[in-house]
Amino acid sequence: MAHFTLDTFTFNKDVRKVSFGEYNIRPPLIKPSKLTYVENGGVGKELSDGWALNFAIGCIHACPFCYVDNIHKRFTFARVGDVVQRPWGMYFLKPRNIDEAIKKTPWKRWKGKLVMMSSTHDPYLPQLYPTSRKILEKALPAGVKFLIQTRSVLVTKDLDLLSEYKDQVILQVSIATLEEKFASIIEPRAPPPKARLEVLRKAKEVGLKVGVIVAPIFPPNKVREDVKEDLEMIMKELADIGVDQVFGEMLHERGMNMEYIESLLWEKVKIDKELDEELGKMFTELLNKYHLRGKWWYEKH
């Protein structure tokens, strides 16, 4: 196990050390995505009809488990330079030409198609609002459907707009744990999980379809020892809210994320096929117990 200090990755709520910048984004804003059904040529995650809308590079939440940092370090470097070599959560670029890109995107081309917003960053980061609303104001009247994936509470600012097009919208949040100390380590700049549950309640009150990705589920560790107890607490809350769909998956190794995580937890984290099967069984049993509709996403080992 590599030994890093917290200062190495600066996973804290202070964003003053983040490298902020701009880049040019190429329209159309909607691009192909593998986060869809296998029948659509995807990886078996039912999050879109094979389309995603991303409009930033980086994410301020700084979750150490995130797979996106590995993508940027491998593929985005040639386009934006050394900034993506900084630790995850310490670089963030937004498009300087976003208004032009919104205007040049032929939204009606995706009429009736489910688009994920967003797959490589949170679309409701403070640095991106009200850009997210500008996009929706153009896309929703054109008939585009959206699965909005967020950890932010800022989405509640747009419930008026989203409820107007409720047949075209699924509002979905990510929750990895309800244990507050553990959440503060693995989701250092995201709003607390209980605040995200409140987002779902407010969305249901205005008639929106809502979902949750319970992920990533970590194996037992010194900070959060009892996985089943944590999962059961989550499922109880989701059943009480009346969540429409629930997906789950365990922690996966991507790029340097395991080194980040182990340095923050100060212990080795073991993940393997046996753990995936054990957690998948536990998750499915809890879905059935609380009469929730959903699915466990198994890793392809």
UniProtKB/Swiss-Prot annotation:
InterPro entries: Elp3/MiaA/NifB-like_rSAM, MJ0683-like, rSAM. Keywords: 4Fe-4S, Iron, Iron-sulfur, Metal-binding, S-adenosyl-L-methionine. Residues 45-286 form the Radical SAM core domain. One of its GO terms (molecular function) is metal ion binding. PANTHER family: RADICAL SAM CORE DOMAIN-CONTAINING PROTEIN (PTHR43432:SF4), SLR0285 PROTEIN (PTHR43432). This is Uncharacterized protein ORF301. It comes from Acidianus two-tailed virus (ATV).
